[in-house]
Amino acid sequence: HVRMKRHCENARMISKYLLQNSKISKVYWPGFENHENHLIAKKQMRDYGAMISFVTKNNDFKKAIQIIERLKIFTLAESLGGVESLAGHPASMTHASIPKKVREESGVVDSLIRLSVGIEDVDDLIDDLDQAIH
């Protein structure tokens, strides 16, 4: 329980940071009341989890790759369940074999980045994202 509490607290803080970042156009996290599955998550979960996805402004594939490459604490991975913070770029990883049109229709746009937020110090994680995004 202690571990999940830390995951969720970190995800909440990172989601709020991303939401206020001028270089980010969309943030997906079920703790936001405007998230399409917020009520389901509220009913089924004790908290809102540690999975976050976000889209950069202008939906730039190359910019998303640059962000991933600049991350120092978040590790590039397709796995999503450890105590460490992980980042992935679905358009070039898990969904790379899906035709772009089909992929984008399902919401996996070119600049979508998926995070599995770990239990590291949240200020360090936010600083890492900030330096990678800017």
Where in this protein do the model-derived segments appear?
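PLP-dependent enzyme catalytic core of the Aspartate aminotransferase-like
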Residues: 3, 58, 85-134
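Histidine-centered active-site/metal-ligand motif
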Residues: 7, 21, 35, 89, ...
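Generic short alpha-helical hydrophobic face used as a protein-protein interaction/packing hotspot
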Residues: 10-11, 71, 91, 119
